[in-house]
Structure formats: C-alpha cells, structure tokens
Regions:
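Conserved, mostly hydrophobic/aromatic
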Residues: 3, 33, 58, 97, ...
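N-terminal amphipathic alpha-helix/helix-capping segment at the start of soluble metabolic enzymes
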Residues: 1-13, 77, 81, 107, ...
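Glycine- and other small-residue-rich loops at beta-strand/loop junctions that grip anionic moieties
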Residues: 39, 94, 190, 213-220, ...
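Metal- or metallocofactor-binding catalytic centers and their adjacent structured scaffolds
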Residues: 29-109
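Structured beta-strand/loop patches that form or line metal/cofactor-binding pockets in enzymes
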Residues: 1-43
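Metal-dependent enolase-superfamily TIM-barrel catalytic cores that perform enediolate-based chemistry
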Residues: 124, 129-252, 257
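Shared catalytic-loop signature of beta/alpha-barrel
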Residues: 48, 56, 72, 229, ...
Length: 326
C-alpha cells in the first residue's frame, strides 16, 4: 500500500468558534482506496500559508510512501532541510500527516487506532472546560467589560452551569484574562483583582470542583511566584504556563516556589522539549496537543516519559474535531 494523492482544506469555524477561528485538514488517499484524515494545529502563519507548507511536505515526503512506515515518515520530515530540531510549524504539519497515516492504518487493520497503540486503559476520564460565555462568540468585543473573562459574578454563574453538566473542573485565567499581560510583574491592584476573581468562583463551586489556572505565560518568574502565593489558599489543581515556555529553567523556578502543580505543553513539540521540562522539574502536568506535538506515536513516547517521572497528561483540547478525536 502506498499513498498516491492528498488534498488539503482550510475550514472556517463559525461562532461561537470553539477550538479556533478556522481548522486546517489534510486527506491522504492510498492506492487501495483507503482514506485517512489529519489536522494541523498551527497559528504561526496564516491559514493558507500553513496549507501551502502542508502541501509541500506531503508532496516531498508522503506521496509514494507506505503509510505504515510511521517512524520513517517522522524522521524524514523532522530532519528536513538538515534541521533536525523542534520547530513548531514543521512539527505541526508532521502531526497532521502522521495522524492521517494512523487513520489509514486503523482502517486497513479494521481496528481503532488506540488498540494498535497499547489498547484501552481507563473506562472513564475526568473532563474540564474553560469558562466560556453562555452565548455569542468565545472572542468577545474588546469594549465589552461585562463578560465571563473579566466579571467574576458572571464567571461564577457560568462555572455552576458547567458543574451541572458534569464537569469536575473549570479553567480560567485568574488575572482577568489578558488584563495582566505585560510579561512582567503584576501590580498589587492586579493581584487583588486576581484573588477576588478566583475566590468568587471557588465560593460558587465549592471544594469538590477543581480550579485550573489557564494563564498564558504573561508573568516573569517573580511575578508568577507572587500570584501563586496569593492563590495557593484557594487550592487550585494547576497553574498553566506561568511564564513563557521558551525558558524551562524559569518555569522550574516557579515550580519550586509554589505548592500549585505547574502545567505546560500546548506550545511545545516533540519528546525532546517535553523531556527537558521533566528533567528540570519545571512541570508535573503535560498539556501536549496532538496536532502540534508530532503526532500520535510521538505523544505515546511523551506519555512514557511522563510515566517515568510520575507526571500526568492533560491533553490540550483547543483544536478541531480531528485532533480532538485523536
């Protein structure tokens, strides 16, 4: 069996736009008629630029090759242009192509892919959600200062809606999303606001529901530590990307200074970057995205690294339907 053709799609995602403003898909077609689908999670360039890069990579490394040869595909693409280093744009494209190959393999074997990667482990998994507006776009008008991202009462009310739906954790940016976003030290007033925002949600949902801090790397190490100390009494389950992900040692400083578990990974790719996170004790919860990390087999390898370090996985699910299924 070989892959004889492919097709790419950029699909707009109408409001409320859960998972992104658009999705980028690839379809691989084999000479036996089996079709596999994959999805790129990449916002580094415009959608159609990413689509052109996807086409180029598929033409050079996928067409004419056996979809079962996952390791060969991975090594050829990862080493393209004599680079052989983590590159989030290239590895996102590789993720989509690898995912589509696994789709073909599963169909050819008449087996769900999870059975080919070790089989089912859990009967049930916990599920969390970000606190989104109850209606309208997840990207509200910037002039609106009364939505769930900044109004603690509205956020608390929405959190209760999610609890009623069966979610056991809710995620939000305690810094009043994007209001503390200068890459540095939060002011005393900003710390007060963050604490009040978090406390209001904790009071609403009680102690049985976990709170997840979905920050976006907007603090310096010292600023993140100050915020963590303020919020530790409210018993959050994790503090996500307290500092930018490009300095693992800085993240490790934060991890060593707070009792809140640190989570990271949505902007990382390949086992090499995740291995560094684990070796430096920078995070104990890994948030890999299947459309960016390097594909299913690469995710399986990262899961093995996490197992060795007694870390946990919480896959990043801001994505389209194919990455979500993967």
């Amino acid at each position: 069996m070989i892959i004889k053709d492919f097709e790419t799609f950029v699909v707009g995602n109408p409001p409320p736009r859960f998972g992104g403003r658009y999705f980028i898909f690839v379809k691989l077609v084999t000479d036996t008629g089996i079709i596999g689908y994959g999805e790129v999670y990449c916002a580094t360039f415009s959608a159609h630029t990413v689509e052109a890069m996807l086409k180029d990579t598929a033409e050079r490394y996928v067409v004419g090759h056996d979809p079962f040869h996952i390791e060969r595909l991975w090594r050829r693409v990862y080493g393209a242009g004599y680079t052989q280093r983590p590159d989030v744009s290239l590895v996102s494209i590789l993720s989509a192509l690898e995912m589509a190959c696994w789709d073909i393999i599963g169909k050819a074997c008449d087996k769900p892919v999870f059975e080919l990667l070790g089989g089912q482990v859990h009967e049930r998994l916990r599920s969390y959600t970000y606190i989104y507006p109850s209606k309208g776009d997840v990207y509200p008008d910037k002039s609106d200062d009364d939505h769930v991202y900044v109004n603690p009462d509205r956020a608390a009310e929405r959190a209760l809606d999610y609890v009623a739906q069966g979610f056991t954790a809710v995620k939000f940016d305690p810094a009043g999303p994007y209001t503390v976003f200068d890459g540095g030290m939060p002011t005393g007033e900003e710390l007060d606001r963050s604490e009040a925002f978090t406390r209001r949600i904790r009071e609403a949902v009680g102690g049985e529901i976990d709170l997840l801090f979905g920050t976006h790397g907007q603090f310096s190490p010292a600023g993140a530590i100050r915020l963590a100390k303020r919020l530790e009494p409210l018993d959050p389950l994790w503090f996500e990307e307290p500092v930018p992900p490009d300095n693992i040692q800085a993240m490790a400083r934060v991890a060593g200074s707070t009792s809140i578990p640190i989570a990271t990974g949505e902007r990382l790719c390949t086992k090499y970057e995740f291995a560094q996170v684990l070796q430096d004790n920078a995070a104990s919860i890994l948030q890999l995205n299947l459309g960016r990390v390097g594909g299913l087999l690469e995710a399986k390898k990262i899961a093995a690294l996490a197992e060795v370090h007694h870390a946990q996985l919480a896959p990043h699910m801001y994505c389209g339907p194919i990455v979500g299924a993967a």
